[in-house]
Regions:
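Short, solvent-exposed alpha-helical surface patches in non-cytosolic proteins
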Residues: 172-174, 267, 307-308, 427-430, ...
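Beta-lactam-recognizing serine transpeptidase/beta-lactamase-like catalytic domain environment
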Residues: 2-12, 84, 207-219, 232, ...
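Short, solvent-exposed beta-strand edge segments and adjacent coil->beta transition regions
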Residues: 89-91, 131-133, 223-227, 294-296, ...
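Short flexible coil/turn linkers enriched for glycine and charged/polar residues
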Residues: 169, 199, 301, 531-533, ...
Length: 672
């Protein structure tokens, strides 16, 4: 068969066909390029621009991160005794996708964990979910963990966590504080030093397949928290709490506080509250027991405040210890208000005014001092402002500005009314008298260390300001010794030691807003030995009952029962050289408080000859203590060891002079 021949157009047909073909090829190539470009752009977007977003989505779909509590750093007393530690415990988890019979598993787990019916139903609902991980019970005791382990249930596992444990139970509980269920500090040192103690959380990453079946888990290690070393001495703290509990029980008091402090450094050796609580099970106690009354509760101090009225008057030379004061036959009228003494006194020397605690006599002296001078000294002693101690919840008390005083205020303030103070403020102010006149900032933390024992930071003694001259301190001490030797504080006496102190019985405000004739706060604060104080001790009992419930009756003997064991603990020599002091079983290695230097400690000089000792090369603490004992007001610059000092070694010095110590670490530069 012969096909017909198509007509040919030699001149134009090939050219048109080729053009069409070429155009089609170009369009096809362009389409391919555009398609490839879109793919490339999309790939760049997915793999480069949006990579992190899709990685997060993928991880979210295939991984679950479980945060485990970090190991909190320990809290230790000054001698390394453990007050708060973290112990390993087991937590129980389940992988629901690996459990074949969630109903049976829930029933058996509920029996082992002693769950009620409602909790068992909740657990069963959790096990029936299509999830890779659920908590069954966290931080169980060893017996419970073993009971669950004995069930040998598929899909049930264990992970090691840690729990806070307080080995000394109630000891210093208001100071140490406690942690909540999430292992976060809720009060005390646990709260105040949370950032140091908490550490970095451990993470458990669980990986799953497309059906959410676990493929295993990866543990990301935690970082332990830092160690916090307190100024407390466990032995002295134990004595303070034991004797305070006894006194509260014997007197029927509502509550009580006791503080033992080193007056030269401001370090708190004991801080006791009663009633107390066990932080291992803090939920079992009313929240009022968690409160640290020594820093958060203010009260009218009563006659113990006469210490500061007397100190200001003697410093300003408006009275002499042997000057006779007219005590008005037991009363004085101020601004139309009659102020009565607790007894009828007529003419008393000022030292007798203090020994017998005459309100009228103190009012007479305060009137000579004047309101502006009086206010200046009281604020100098720190009243009306927080002490700055590293404890949460501290209040500054109440001292109104003079423009808000009434015509009666100066008289009332002179014997401790119309003012609110905390127990720690009061102890710190008395420490300023005991140490020669310098107000020291009270400290509760000595240092913070890392897990290897390296010091992160420490707390050297800080002199806030000088309040009294040494001569005034000597005169005040003599007055306070008279209180114990022949006045209202006889029961505070300690055999073999000279004690200086003052009693107080402060009326409380009743529901009508008036001073109660029944309820009061009984207190005693003092220092011992009077000539070279090693400790300041404050005790306060809230609303003691019974026929003998004054400060001299109930607080003074409590002072003695706490101070005497503290002196033994610190091996402070007796004022009577014929007495042999029995040591209270000190630990093998301990750091002595500043108020006592053992015989083998480096001495500032062979004798205190009125010359500046050579303090170069010493630690900040050792140098500051040595200088403070010579009556110097110490100013520290820098950190580390002493590299320079002013006055220079060998220069003549006298009490009250300023002393600058420049500190530097090895390889560092001294401050300019």
């Amino acid at each position: 068969m012969t096909l017909p021949l198509l007509p040919r157009h030699d001149s134009d047909m090939p050219t048109a066909y080729q053009r069409t073909l070429r155009l089609r090829l170009m369009l096809l190539a362009l389409g391919v390029c555009l398609w490839a470009g879109v793919i490339v752009v999309r790939l760049v977007q997915l793999q480069v621009l949006d990579r992190s977003k899709y990685e997060v989505q993928a991880a979210r779909q295939s991984e679950r991160t479980i945060n485990l509590d970090p190991r909190r750093g320990p809290i230790l007393d000054r001698n390394g005794r453990q007050l708060a530690v973290s112990v390993d415990v087991e937590s129980i988890y389940a992988v629901p996708t690996d459990i074949d019979d969630p109903v049976r598993s829930a029933r058996e787990l509920a029996t082992a964990l002693q769950l009620d019916a409602a909790a068992r139903r909740t657990l069963q609902a959790q096990l029936q979910r299509t999830r890779a991980f659920v908590w069954v019970r966290r931080k169980v005791d060893a017996a419970t963990a073993q009971a669950v382990r004995d069930l040998q249930l598929e899909g049930v596992g264990f992970v090691t966590e840690n729990r806070r444990y307080y080995p000394q139970r109630e000891l210093a509980s208001q100071v140490i504080g406690y942690v909540g269920l999430d292992n976060t500090g809720m009060s005390g040192i646990e709260y105040a030093f949370e950032d140091d103690i908490k550490g970095r959380a451990q993470k458990m990453v669980i990986r799953t397949d497309a059906r959410r079946r676990p493929l295993g888990h990866i543990d990301k290690p935690s970082t332990d928290g830092h160690t916090v070393v307190l100024t407390l001495d466990e032995s002295i703290q134990h004595v303070a709490e034991r004797e305070l509990e006894r006194a509260v029980a014997e007197t029927g008091s509502v509550a009580g506080v006791a503080i033992v402090m080193d007056p030269h450094t401001g370090e708190i050796l004991a801080l006791a509250n009663h009633p107390t609580f066990n932080p291992n099970r803090f939920q079992a106690y009313p929240s009022a027991r968690w409160r640290n009354r020594a820093v958060s509760d203010s009260f009218e101090p009563g006659s113990v405040f006469k210490i500061f009225t007397a100190a200001a008057a003697l410093q300003e030379k408006v009275v002499d210890p042997d000057e006779v004061i007219d005590c008005g036959h037991g009363f004085v009228e101020v601004a139309g208000v009659r102020i009565n003494d607790h007894d009828v006194f007529d003419q008393l020397r000022f030292r007798e005014v203090m020994a017998k605690s005459s309100d009228v006599g103190v009012v007479r002296v305060a009137q000579r001092l004047g309101r502006e001078n009086f206010n200046r000294y009281m604020r100098g002693f720190g009243f009306g402002s927080p002490t700055g101690v590293d404890l949460p919840g501290e209040t500054g008390g109440l001292l109104r500005p003079t423009e808000r005083w009434s015509a009666l205020s100066l008289a009332s303030l002179s014997f401790g009314q119309e003012i609110g103070v905390t127990a720690l403020q009061l102890a710190s102010a008395v420490a300023a008298v005991a140490n020669g006149g310098a107000l020291m900032r009270p400290t509760i933390v000595r240092r913070v260390e890392d897990r290897d024992g390296n010091v992160i930071r420490s707390t050297p003694p800080v002199s806030v300001r000088r309040v009294l001259e040494p001569a005034t301190v000597t005169a005040v001490t003599a007055l306070l010794e008279g209180v114990v030797e022949g006045g209202t504080g006889k029961l505070a006496a300690i055999p073999g030691y000279r004690v200086a102190g003052k009693t107080g019985t402060a009326q409380k405000i009743d529901a009508s807003g008036r001073y109660s004739m029944i309820d009061h706060v009984a207190s005693f604060v003092g220092y011992v030995p009077a000539s070279r104080p090693a400790v300041v001790v404050l005790v306060s009992l809230d609303t003691p009952r019974g026929p003998r419930n004054q400060g001299g009756d109930v607080a003074a003997p409590l002072f003695a029962r706490i101070a005497e064991p503290a002196l033994r603990r610190l091996a402070v020599p007796s004022d009577d050289p014929t007495r042999v002091l029995r040591a209270a079983a000190p630990p093998a290695a301990r750091v002595m408080p500043a108020s006592y230097v053992p015989a083998n400690a480096p001495a500032a000089s062979d004798d205190d000859d009125g010359r500046m000792p050579d303090l170069r090369g010493r630690s900040a603490r050792e140098a500051a203590i040595t200088a403070a004992r010579r009556g110097l007001v110490v100013e520290l610059k820098g950190s580390g060891r002493v590299v320079d000092q002013r006055p220079e070694a060998g220069a003549a010095i006298e009490a009250g002079m300023s002393c600058r110590l420049d500190l530097a670490r090895p390889g560092g530069q001294a401050p300019r």
